[in-house]
Design a protein with these regions (language model features):
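Conserved interdomain hinge at the start of the Helicase C-terminal
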Residues: 182-186
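Substrate-binding/active-site clefts of carbohydrate-active enzymes
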Residues: 1-53, 71-82, 97-98, 115
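Short, solvent-exposed loop/turn elements at beta->coil junctions and helix N-caps
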Residues: 267-277
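Substrate-binding cleft of secreted/luminal carbohydrate-active enzymes
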Residues: 188-209
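Active-site-proximal helices and loops of the catalytic beta/alpha 8
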Residues: 45-47, 51-156, 161, 179-180, ...
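Short glycine/proline-rich turn/loop motifs
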Residues: 19-34, 52-54, 164-174, 227-237
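Active-site glycine-centered loops adjacent to acidic/histidine catalytic or metal-binding residues
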Residues: 60, 168, 203-205
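Acidic/polar loop patches that form or flank catalytic/metal-binding clefts of enzymes
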Residues: 88-89, 196-203, 261-267
Length: 281
C-alpha cells in the first residue's frame, strides 16, 4: 500500500489516509496525482514553464501531504528531462531524521526515494529563532546548533540542504530576535557560512519587520519599486542607517561566501560551545 510509505511506521491507517487524501487547508483543494491524465497534464505544464521562463530550480510545496510515491514519480519526470536542475522539497517536519527521509538517495527502511535532490532545514530555522534569546545550558542557547549539526550524518547530501532564517509562512527573523542588531547579524552570519546553501527571503537583507498577528510570514511589502511608495529601499538613500548597516553586512558576507570554495563544498567541523562561544569551520 502506498499509505505505508508515509514516514511514521506507528501511525494509524486512518491518519495515513487523512494525510494523503485530505485537503491541506479548507481553501486549498488537493489535486489527485494518482489520476494519470492529471499527472500527465501537471508534468507537461511544468516542463512548458521551465522551457518558457528558463526556470533553473523548483520548490515543491508541502511535499509530505501528497501521495508521496506519486509525488516522487512526478519529481522524477523533471529530473529525467533536466538532470542538473535543483528541486527542493518543503518538508516541514520536526527532526533532522525526518527531513533526511525526504532527501533522494537516503537508505530508508521502507525503500522510499523522494527523488528530491534538496530539502529545507526547518529544524535549523527553529534553533536560529530561539538560540540567541536563551541562556546557555545543555539543551538551550548555542548548544542547540552543536546538537543539530551532529545529526548531519542522516543526510545523503548535506551540502544540498537549504537553510533559511524566515519565509512567507513564519515569523520574520527580526521578530524572533526583537530587532536586536547584534543577534540579527549572528543569524545572518550563520546562514551564510554554515553547511548547505542559503535562501534569503525578500526584506531579510534590511531587517524588514512583519505585521503582528499575521500568521503567514508577517508580510509587509518591500518599500520601493512603485511610484506611490514613500521611499525606495532598493537604494542606499532610501534605506535607514540601520537598514544600510544590515544590508552592507549581508552583502559583504554574500561576497565572501561567493569567493570561498570551502563554504560551497568543504567539510564542516564544529567545537562544543564553551563560555558563550560556539566555533565552527
Amino acid at each position: 500500500k502506498e499509505e505505508e510509505k508515509i514516514r511514521s511506521f506507528s501511525s494509524s491507517e486512518i491518519d495515513k489516509k487523512i494525510l494523503k487524501d485530505g485537503w491541506f487547508a479548507g481553501n486549498m483543494p488537493d489535486l489527485d496525482l494518482t489520476n494519470p491524465e492529471l499527472f500527465r497534464y501537471l508534468s507537461q505544464a511544468y516542463i512548458w514553464w521551465i522551457e518558457y521562463a528558463d526556470v533553473d530550480g523548483i520548490r515543491v510545496d508541502t511535499y509530505p501531504y501528497n501521495d508521496i510515491q506519486v509525488a516522487a514519480d512526478w519529481v522524477k519526470t523533471f529530473r529525467n528531462e533536466y538532470p542538473n536542475m535543483n528541486i527542493v522539497g518543503e518538508c516541514w517536519v520536526k527532526s533532522p531524521l525526518e527531513i533526511a527521509y525526504y532527501q533522494s538517495g537516503n537508505n530508508n527502511k521502507d525503500g522510499f526515494d523522494s527523488q528530491l535532490p534538496s530539502v529545507m532545514d526547518f529544524v535549523l530555522k527553529d534553533h536560529l529563532h530561539a538560540a540567541f534569546n536563551e541562556n546557555e545550558s545543555w539543551d538551550f542557547g548555542l548548544p542547540r546548533f552543536y546538537t543539530h549539526y551532529a545529526q548531519d550524518f542522516a543526510y545523503p547530501d548535506v551540502d544540498n540542504v537549504m537553510n533559511f532564517l524566515d519565509n512567507h509562512d513564519i515569523d520574520r527573523f527580526s521578530t524572533a530576535v526583537k530587532r536586536d542588531v547584534n543577534k540579527y547579524k549572528m543569524g545572518i552570519a550563520m546562514l551564510l557560512t554554515t553547511r548547505g546553501y542559503p535562501q534569503i527571503y525578500a526584506g531579510t537583507e534590511i531587517m524588514l519587520d512583519g505585521i503582528p498577528g499575521n500568521y503567514e510570514g508577517h508580510r509587509f511589502d518591500f518599500p520601493g519599486g512603485w511610484d506611490e511608495d514613500e521611499r525606495d529601499a532598493f537604494t542606499k538613500e532610501g534605506r535607514t542607517a540601520e537598514e544600510n548597516e544590515i544590508f552592507d553586512y549581508t552583502r559583504a558576507l554574500l561576497n565572501y561566501r561567493k569567493a570561498t570554495p570551502a563554504l560551497h563544498n568543504g567539510k564542516m567541523t564544529q567545537f562544543i560551545p564553551y563560555d558563550g562561544i560556539y566555533l565552527y569551520a
